[in-house]
């Protein structure tokens, strides 16, 4: 009986469960030129290793990481080696290796829920300023005494984005909470989160929200035999889209979704530029990757006819491509296959409801730059929490000895 009572007790919230939802927020700021989030990663990893003296490497992620570092090692004879970038990536790998068996999904949901209330309050407050008062809004500064690592936090937007630098970043951050609410059938929470995403007018966020609701209706019909509920969800989505489409504040986002065209520079950069550049490269580049440090250097090299893509050297976003385009160009077709295999492994090893978030992450790599950055860490931290099978390598730190064993 006591054992049953203990099993029903809520586990104590760990440092890692607090850190995951906060990471994207704090990583927007700098201390002495260093990302605050990266400093916190070092601290969290150090505390974790001292306490547990072990970590779990997710095999598909580790294989992809090894491929990238070996690739960059050989490429450094042409382009040099970005030490700072790889220190950051090593730290990201380590923090993701602290997830398995140490992060309780229910605790993570509770923490995200509390932080989500505060962040959504910022969205609703800024929505009042933008849509009722007609004011422009800037990022709500969490640390007034620190500088952001982007100049965007000083800019005024006509779109609410709360504590984030842009609306798309807010939507990417809040989507895990929406999926966790779906898994727990917290419908009121789902509605409020969905409304906050609509208010941000992020086309990516609105698209992902629609995917999540459709996934939920499909699961309800297939697994729970709740066909009426599924029809209601689809009906509400159709009515909601029809109602919101008549509001001027959502016209821009809806037009971006309904009128996607490769001739539009914004759409082209986000969706197809990476693919266009990849197919235009020589065969050797397709196999081994471009012989440049990054995509921007490649586009400034003279090898790319920028006018063909309606681009110029003075653009601030020159070199921006989506995550899958970045992977293809830098690491070639073999890197791309390992990247996609990583998602496939997580998909296979996730439960039914967790697959929904994996699906949104897969879609995001076609429209967002989420390749080994803070959003990448947040996405994979959430996905690895729900991995059920045993694709992990246990690394135990002993007395000068590191022992590896398969779980």
Name what the model sees in each region.
Residues 1-52, 67-75, 363, 377-382:
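N-terminal signal-anchor transmembrane segment
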Residues 125, 220-262:
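A membrane-periplasm/extracellular boundary helix in multi-pass inner-membrane enzymes
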Residues 60-69, 78-102:
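Aromatic-anchored transmembrane helix interface
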Residues 12-22, 318, 345-372, 381-383:
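Loop-to-helix entry and N-terminal half of a specific, functionally important transmembrane alpha helix
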Residues 186, 213-218, 225-232, 324-362:
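Hydrophobic transmembrane alpha-helices and their immediate junctions
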Residues 260-331:
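Long extracytoplasmic/lumenal interhelical loops at the membrane interface
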């Amino acid at each position: 009986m006591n054992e049953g009572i203990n099993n029903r007790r809520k586990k104590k919230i760990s440092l890692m469960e607090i850190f995951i939802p906060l990471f994207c927020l704090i990583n927007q700021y700098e201390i002495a030129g260093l990302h605050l989030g990266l400093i916190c990663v070092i601290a969290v990893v150090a505390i974790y290793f001292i306490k547990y003296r072990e970590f779990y490497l997710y095999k598909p992620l580790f294989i992809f990481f090894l491929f990238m570092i070996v690739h960059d090692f050989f490429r450094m004879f042409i382009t040099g080696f970005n030490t700072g970038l790889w220190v950051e990536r090593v730290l990201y790998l380590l923090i993701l290796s602290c997830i398995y068996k140490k992060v309780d999904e229910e605790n993570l949901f509770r923490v995200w829920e509390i932080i989500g209330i505060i962040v959504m309050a910022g969205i609703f407050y800024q929505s009042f300023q933008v849509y009722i008062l007609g004011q422009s809004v800037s990022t709500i500064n969490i640390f007034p005494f620190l500088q952001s690592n982007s100049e965007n936090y000083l800019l005024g937007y006509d779109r609410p984005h709360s504590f984030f630098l842009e609306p798309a970043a807010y939507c990417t951050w809040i989507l895990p909470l929406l999926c966790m609410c779906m898994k727990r059938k917290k419908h009121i929470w789902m509605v409020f989160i969905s409304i906050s995403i609509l208010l941000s007018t992020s086309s990516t966020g609105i698209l992902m929200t629609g995917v999540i609701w459709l996934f939920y209706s499909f699961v309800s019909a297939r697994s729970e035999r709740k066909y009426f509920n599924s029809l209601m969800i689809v009906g509400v989505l159709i009515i909601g889209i029809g109602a919101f489409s008549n509001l001027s504040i959502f016209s821009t986002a809806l037009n971006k979704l309904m009128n996607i065209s490769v001739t539009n520079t914004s759409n082209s950069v986000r969706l197809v530029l990476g693919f266009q550049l990849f197919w235009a490269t020589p065969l050797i580049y397709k196999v081994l990757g471009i012989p440049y440090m990054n995509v921007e250097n490649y586009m400034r090299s003279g090898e790319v006819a920028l006018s063909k893509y309606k681009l110029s050297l003075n653009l601030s976003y020159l070199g921006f491509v989506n995550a899958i385009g970045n992977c293809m160009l830098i690491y070639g077709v073999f890197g791309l296959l390992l990247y996609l295999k990583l998602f496939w492994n997580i998909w296979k090893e996730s439960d039914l409801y967790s697959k929904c978030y994996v699906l949104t992450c897969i879609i995001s790599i076609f429209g967002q730059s989420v390749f080994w950055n803070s959003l990448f860490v947040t996405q994979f931290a959430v996905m690895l929490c729900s991995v059920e099978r045993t694709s992990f390598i246990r690394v135990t730190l002993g007395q000068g000895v590191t022992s590896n064993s398969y779980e």
